[in-house]
Amino acid sequence: MNLHEYQAKDLLESYGLKVQKGIVAHNPNEAAQAFDQLGGKFAVIKAQVHAGGRGKAGGVKVVKSSQEAREVAESLIGKNLVTFQTDAEGQPVNSVGIFEDVYPVTRELYLGAVVDRSSRKVTFMASTEGGVDIEEVAHNSPEKILKVEVDPLVGLQPFQAREVAFKLGLEGKQINDFVKTMLGAYKAFIECDFALFEINPLAVRENGEIVCVDGKINLDSNALYRHPKLLALRDKSQENAKELKASEHELNYVALEGNIGCMVNGAGLAMATMDIIQLYGGKPANFLDVGGGATKERVIEAFKLILDDENVKAVLINIFGGIVRCDMIAEAIIEAVKEVNVTVPVVVRLEGNNAEKGAKILADSGLKLIPADGLADAADKVVKSLG
C-alpha cells in the first residue's frame, strides 16, 4: 500500500525526521489559505498522486501568491495526472500539498531503504546524487550509490549511519543530523512494516539543516492488519480498479497489456503460465492467482474479472489441484461461463486432485470449452485460438 507524500512526511516527522512543512488542500480556496498560513514568499504545490515523475508531468509548481496557489490548485485538482509511472489514463488528483520553500540549498542527497530479498535484510541506499531519478544513477553511475545492509538481530547501528554521512561528505552538525535521520527512518521502517521508502531529495540547506523535501513510502500490505491507523490512510482512488476489486475477493491480480487472460492457482504456476504463453507467441493480459485454497465464489469472481478486460480475446485456466479440488473448479467454471456472456475461446488445463472428474464435468457440460493435456498443450491451444 502506497502513501501520499504528505502522509509519508507526517509519518517520518513522527519518528524525529526534519521534513519540509506543508498543508494538504482539497480545493483551490484551501490552497490559497495554506499559502497564507505558511507565510513565505514562495511555496511549492505538488499534486498528491501515487506516482513518480510529477515534476516533468506538470504536477509540481512554484507559486508566489495565494492567488497563484488558488489557480494552480484549480488546474490540478479533479484532473488526472499522467506520468511515466502511470498508464495512459493517469492518476486522479484529489488533493495537492502546499509546501514551504526550503531553497536555496547547498546539496541534494538521496536516502532510501528496501527489503532486499537476496540478502534477506533491510538495505539502505544513499547517494550524493539526490533530486534526480535514482534508477538513472544506478544504471549510469552505480559507484555513486552507497549500500548498508542491516543485521536484523541488532538493527541499524549509529556507526553505520556515521560512516554513510562521512562518505556523503557531510561535516560538523550535519553528521549528527544525518545519523538521527537515518536511525529514525530505520525505526519507522521496522515498526510500520515498510516495504520501501525514499527521501529524494534529502536537502542540505544553507544554514546546514538537513530536510526531507520529498517522501515516498510503500507499506507491506500483508502486515496492514497490525496497523489499523495506517490502513485508514489508504486511498483507493489511486489503485487500479480491477486490482482493487480483486483484493476485495482475496485474489492476487495484476493487469498487463496482452490479450490472453490467465486464471491460475499459485503464484509460481501463474508466473510459469505467463512465461509459456509468451514462449508460444502470445501475450498475457494479466497475472491472476486465485490461491491454493480457492473457493467456487472466488473462481467465479476471477472469471468475471478477466472478462471485464476488453482486450482479452482468449482465456487460459490452469489449475493444479492440491488443496483445491479440480471438480469444484470445473463446477465454478461452468457456473461462471453461464453467468457471464463468454464470447472468447476458453482453454482449460486441470491436473492433480480430482482432475479426471473435473475434466468429465467440463466435457459433459455442453459448453464450448477447449480441454488441454499439459501446460505446453494449453499454451499452444490458447495462442492458436486467437487465429
From Swiss-Prot:
Annotated residues that bind substrate are located at: N265, G322, I323, V324
So where does Mg(2+) get bound? Answer: N200, D214
Reaction catalysis annotation: succinate + ATP + CoA = succinyl-CoA + ADP + phosphate; GTP + succinate + CoA = succinyl-CoA + GDP + phosphate
EC number of the protein: 6.2.1.5
State where ATP binds.
Answer: K46, G53, R54, G55, E100, Y103, E108
Recorded superkingdom: Bacteria
> Which pathway does the database say it acts in?
Carbohydrate metabolism; tricarboxylic acid cycle; succinate from succinyl-CoA (ligase route): step 1/1
What Gene Ontology molecular function terms does this protein carry?
ATP binding; magnesium ion binding; succinate-CoA ligase (ADP-forming) activity; succinate-CoA ligase (GDP-forming) activity
Instruction: List this protein's GO terms for biological process.
Output: succinyl-CoA metabolic process; tricarboxylic acid cycle
The protein's required cofactors: Mg(2+)
Task: Name a single GO cellular component.
Answer: succinate-CoA ligase complex
- Enzyme class at the top of the EC tree: ligase
Give the record's cofactor note, including how many are bound: Binds 1 Mg(2+) ion per subunit.
Alphabetical UniProt keywords: ATP-binding, Ligase, Magnesium, Metal-binding, Nucleotide-binding, Tricarboxylic acid cycle
Domain (ATP-grasp): residue spans on this chain: 9-245
| UniProt similarity note | Belongs to the succinate/malate CoA ligase beta subunit family.
Subunit structure and binding partners: Heterotetramer of two alpha and two beta subunits.
PANTHER family, sorted: SUCCINATE--COA LIGASE [GDP-FORMING] SUBUNIT BETA, MITOCHONDRIAL, SUCCINYL-COA SYNTHETASE BETA CHAIN
Function noted in UniProt: Succinyl-CoA synthetase functions in the citric acid cycle (TCA), coupling the hydrolysis of succinyl-CoA to the synthesis of either ATP or GTP and thus represents the only step of substrate-level phosphorylation in the TCA. The beta subunit provides nucleotide specificity of the enzyme and binds the substrate succinate, while the binding sites for coenzyme A and phosphate are found in the alpha subunit.
Descriptive protein name: Succinate--CoA ligase [ADP-forming] subunit beta
Q: Which organism is it from?
A: Francisella tularensis subsp. holarctica (strain OSU18)
